[in-house]
Amino acid sequence: MLYWLIDFSSSFPAFNVFRYITFRTGGAVVTGALFVFLCGPWIIDNLRLRQGKGQPIRADGPQSHLVTKRGTPTMGGLMILSGLTVGTVLWANPLNPYVWIVLAVTLGFGFVGFYDDYMKVTKQTHAGISGRTRLLIEFAIAGAACFALVWLGRGSLSSSLVIPFFKEVVLNLGWYFVIFGAFVIVGAGNAVNLTDGLDGLAIVPVMIAAASFGMISYLVGNAVFAEYLQINYVAGTGELAVLCGALLGAGLGFLWFNAPPASIFMGDTGSLALGGMLGSIAVAVKHEIVLAVIGGLFVLEAVSVIVQVASFKLTGKRVFRMAPIHHHFEQKGWTEPQIVIRFWIIAVILALAGLSTLKLR
């Protein structure tokens, strides 16, 4: 909404500052963080009061979690989504369609996760919505978003897969891109969901990825920088940097309460929404493959589950002591802080590797 203050810049020249995406991105970071900092305690108290026993802990998971995690409320994603939405609505250009498409995916996935968390808490079981039903809803949301993105672009690039490291190598998938893009968004959402198993493990890599895609969005949406870096220019996507800033700020606020020992878990409400948001931004700015690099930690977690399940069904043997892979290291004797901080380091390295694709052509 503050973007509209530009209309008064002729009378108040200071309002010209709202033209700049960088300034509004910074404002979104601060707004998202302050909102969660200030409202977080109230939200946590209300969730704890309503949930009683908190998030149910899996009996077949690490036994230490039955003691250290029991009674902690979930649905903390509500804090993140609230801060993210307030920061976005306040600082983003309300006339930019990319903003609303990505925000719709984020809140849509958040609603699916919220209902899943609600089912788990009320029934005190780790089984929420059936996997098939959840995936169908996620694919419907993601497919609609990808259709809108292709229609919005109305050009060959909008339906193409861009190959990093090469100057002008693109694969035009036509309308099949809608299917591909939906898989990217749904895959990202569920990969982040699988990563969210230890205090602070998911939110920091999400913030790292958000900061990275904030930079990518700004560069892709700027014709001058895009030409200099020889990357594909997508008009209007620079505004997505503001959303990334709002997510970064809200994530910082949430980490304050999610730092071990966590006062609250983000739950599926947060993890599905944030993963879906990263996936939809990657699709919008034509950096789907780069997402697999920057979000490589999430890919690793998801692949570890796929490999574990496939191996057990085919051979009756497990590759890992427990999946996702962060539980494997728990079973090997690594402490929770060791796993979390080491995975953060991996996330930083992967983000730098992903950002390097912008220059290596």
From Swiss-Prot:
It catalyses: UDP-N-acetyl-alpha-D-muramoyl-L-alanyl-gamma-D-glutamyl-meso-2,6-diaminopimeloyl-D-alanyl-D-alanine + di-trans,octa-cis-undecaprenyl phosphate = di-trans,octa-cis-undecaprenyl diphospho-N-acetyl-alpha-D-muramoyl-L-alanyl-D-glutamyl-meso-2,6-diaminopimeloyl-D-alanyl-D-alanine + UMP. Pathway: Cell wall biogenesis; peptidoglycan biosynthesis. The chain crosses the membrane at residues 25-45, 72-92, 95-115, 135-155, 169-189, 200-220, 240-260, 264-284, 289-309, 338-358. NCBIfam families: mraY. GO terms for biological process: cell division; cell wall organization; peptidoglycan biosynthetic process; regulation of cell shape. The gene is mraY. GO terms for cellular component: plasma membrane. It comes from Rhodopseudomonas palustris (strain HaA2). It is found in: Cell inner membrane. This is Phospho-N-acetylmuramoyl-pentapeptide-transferase. GO terms for molecular function: metal ion binding; phospho-N-acetylmuramoyl-pentapeptide-transferase activity; UDP-N-acetylmuramoyl-L-alanyl-D-glutamyl-meso-2,6-diaminopimelyl-D-alanyl-D-alanine:undecaprenyl-phosphate transferase activity. It is a multi-pass membrane protein. It comes from the Bacteria.
